[in-house]
């Protein structure tokens, strides 16, 4: 997990201040409620009077780590305080073998014989269910290796060209046929293409067919040769014309504890923003900036500043270690960070392995 360096004045807090601050944050993460000096005095490992605790809380408030939501209330951590807690106190453990087994079984089952979109949707749904937040998967445009191409005649002068990738994606295009093309020539053209494009990306397949132009002339008649050339040409620009897409599951989880209309509006804006192209680019950029899991709390990220949400995100990579997408959890700032970080990290690694 990538961690920024906390402010020196915060790092120099004495042990008593750290204990009180840690208990305030842990109480907030568990119950979402302010905690006062009397409750803290019962929770602290050393005996301190409520008056002493109030003095320490005043110092912590002055540092911007905690605040009082009401005049007579206890204290809650600020976003800066949560960041300090994550950087200085949080201990991220490993997932148990059982947790790893459950995640791996669910992801592998969703990918078996299914499309890439299906597997990523299931990953988003699973993260949502395990975290009680909203699961998010960003699928960037990738060039998956091709599996096969097929031509199906629709009319005497029209055919459906079907391009299937090894990740299960299927693309269809209608092409115009030269006059006189027979069904056997359609099969001959597709067989020739499949012999040379399997396992290559679309760009690589086009380069390979250009290199084999002379061999194509010798192996095929003119009509079949025309089909071979047209069969790949119709996907000109397809390497870059499919946009990245975002998959969000578990939106209802974010609404469970929301009662104020203003908070509902903030969440609505968040989901609207997440559907924009700019958000996709920004999220992928965030994932690419660090080697592992990244945590963004509230206003640390412009996309989530209005809703006061947190984002825990990790990239997943292809066989060449290029970032091809990201996945994570969006939720309230009182997420269980220590539990979710290893969950997101392991899921990202697993998805990356299955896509290779």
Curated annotation (Swiss-Prot):
What GO biological process terms does the UniProt entry carry, in alphabetical order? negative regulation of DNA-templated transcription
**Any one GO molecular-function label of the UniProt entry:** DNA binding
Q: Could you name the domain of life of the organism this protein comes from?
A: Bacteria
Keyword Transcription among UniProt keywords: yes
Query: Pfam families attached here?
Result: HrcA
Print the keywords alphabetically.
Answer: Repressor, Stress response, Transcription, Transcription regulation
Cited InterPro entries: GAF-like_dom_sf, HrcA, HrcA_C, WH-like_DNA-bd_sf, WH_DNA-bd_sf, WHTH_transcript_rep_HrcA_IDD
The similarity annotation says:
Belongs to the HrcA family.
What function is annotated for this protein? Negative regulator of class I heat shock genes (grpE-dnaK-dnaJ and groELS operons). Prevents heat-shock induction of these operons.
User: What protein am I looking at?
Assistant: Heat-inducible transcription repressor HrcA
Which organism is this entry from? Chelativorans sp. (strain BNC1)
Whichever gene encodes this chain, its name is hrcA
